[in-house]
């Protein structure tokens, strides 16, 4: 049996972010010039590295591995203290001892996606050919590129077939891509709050964020690391705009309403008079301490390009035809970023392709981010699906 634990290290500050890009506080799988990653844009990326975390114990026949695919601005630190923020892991509602993704039962892997900034090769990494940060010289990547890199990592770990692939939002897109690109390697899959392609509205929101970043003079055409001035203002605005889409009108009303921030009367200025304004400003300012602006451009573009049906003559069901993977598709009633009809389209395509699929629409007012929050119905659904799949896979409560 192989027992692998996450690497622990000191909590970093925002100023150490470039160090995480090349030398992450994580496990690292390095791939040399003889193991290139073929990208959809036609470039062979080599050498490159993947930063990842693992939790739990891989059983003797390597049949209890779960791959968790993270969302856009998350990373591999889903169940351990984050090395930059010092905050708890990003998905502790779902991952950990006794949780639905039970680390006492399963061997859990989460890798930082290619193109991000927490240790996997991306625009914030050093280009070995120049000795400088890649910046916009880094090739444009796609969701399939991310999944191919993950498959290389899974190969490196000696795992032929994953018990389950789980993820929400951009992570859910990766789950769907895994099930299409490597159906024989995925026993079960749980795509959450996602779609098989990005809508025009979501592309528009992403373009708004990208333009905010690129309009910041400190962006310097992507060469801000060389100038020493980072486009924090533009990236903060991008984060503020995106964060609104992760919530719902009901959630904002319940949490903030029109309540004032530390005052009883308006200031008749452009200060943050309302609590919701102060909250958004905090979301923007805290985000820039842990995320790279160019990575934000690259990952949002990857989501925009995602379209499973495009590679199957526009017929989505053809992508899933003959799959033996067991699916559980989950949506949330107040999610207007990836509304329930998007999930129903996935279910219809899976049904047409002859797949085994269950579907759950969770009643909640928490919006898109509900999949990351303490949402009891969703947690119960995840637990039940994984337990059922584990029984079908022949895994006992100890993951053997």
UniProtKB/Swiss-Prot annotation:
It is found in: Cytoplasm. Pfam families: Abhydrolase_1 (PF00561). InterPro entries: AB_hydrolase_1, AB_hydrolase_fold, HAT_MetX-like. It is an enzyme of class 2 (transferase). Residues 1-22 are annotated as: Disordered. The keyword Amino-acid biosynthesis applies. GO terms for biological process: homoserine metabolic process; methionine biosynthetic process. Its EC number is 2.3.1.31. The keyword Acyltransferase applies. Residues 64-374 form the AB hydrolase-1 domain. Pathway: Amino-acid biosynthesis; L-methionine biosynthesis via de novo pathway; O-acetyl-L-homoserine from L-homoserine: step 1/1. It catalyses: L-homoserine + acetyl-CoA = O-acetyl-L-homoserine + CoA. Substrate binds at residues 239, 369. Its main location: cytoplasm. Keywords: Acyltransferase, Amino-acid biosynthesis, Cytoplasm, Methionine biosynthesis, Transferase. The active site is at 169 (nucleophile), 335, 368. GO terms for cellular component: cytoplasm. One of its GO terms (molecular function) is homoserine O-acetyltransferase activity. Belongs to the AB hydrolase superfamily. MetX family. Homodimer. Transfers an acetyl group from acetyl-CoA to L-homoserine, forming acetyl-L-homoserine. HAMAP family: MetX_acyltransf. This is Homoserine O-acetyltransferase. It comes from Rhodopseudomonas palustris (strain HaA2).
């Amino acid at each position: 049996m192989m027992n692998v634990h996450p690497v622990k290290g000191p909590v970093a500050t925002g100023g150490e972010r470039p160090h995480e890009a090349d030398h992450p506080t994580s496990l690292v799988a390095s791939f040399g010039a003889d193991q290139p990653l073929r990208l959809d844009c036609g470039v062979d990326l080599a050498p490159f590295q993947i930063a990842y975390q693992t939790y739990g114990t891989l059983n003797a026949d390597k049949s209890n591995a779960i791959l968790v695919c993270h969302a856009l601005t998350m990373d591999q630190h889903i169940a351990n203290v984050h090395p930059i923020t010092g905050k708890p892991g990003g998905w502790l509602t779902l991952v950990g001892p006794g949780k639905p993704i039970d680390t006492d039962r399963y061997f859990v892997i989460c890798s930082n996606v290619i193109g991000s900034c927490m240790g996997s090769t991306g625009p914030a990494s050093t280009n070995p050919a120049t000795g400088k940060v890649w910046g916009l010289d880094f090739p444009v990547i796609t969701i399939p590129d991310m999944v191919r890199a993950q498959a290389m990592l899974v190969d490196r770990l000696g795992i032929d077939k994953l018990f389950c692939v789980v993820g929400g939002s951009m992570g859910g897109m990766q789950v769907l891509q895994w099930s299409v690109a490597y159906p024989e390697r995925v026993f079960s899959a749980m795509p959450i709050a996602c779609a098989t392609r990005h809508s025009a509205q979501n592309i528009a929101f992403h373009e708004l964020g990208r333009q905010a970043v690129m309009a910041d003079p400190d962006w310097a055409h992507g060469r801000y690391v060389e100038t020493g001035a980072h486009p924090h203002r533009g990236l903060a605005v991008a984060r503020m705009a995106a964060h609104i889409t992760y919530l719902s009108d009901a959630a904002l009303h319940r949490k903030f309403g029109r309540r004032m921030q530390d005052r009883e009367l308006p200031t008749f200025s452009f200060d943050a008079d309302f609590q919701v304004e102060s909250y958004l400003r905090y979301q923007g300012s805290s985000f820039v301490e842990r995320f790279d602006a160019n990575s934000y451009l690259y990952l949002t573009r990857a989501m925009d390009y995602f379209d499973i049906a495009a590679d199957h003559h526009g017929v989505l069901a053809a992508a899933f035809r003959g799959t033996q993977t067991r699916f559980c598709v989950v949506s949330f009633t107040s999610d207007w970023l990836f509304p329930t009809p998007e999930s129903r389209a996935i279910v219809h395509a899976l049904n047409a392709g002859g797949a085994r699929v269950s579907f759950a629409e969770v009643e909640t007012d928490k919006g898109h981010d509900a999949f990351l929050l303490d949402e009891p119905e969703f947690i119960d659904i995840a637990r039940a699906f994984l337990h059922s799949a584990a029984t079908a896979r022949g895994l006992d409560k100890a993951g053997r």
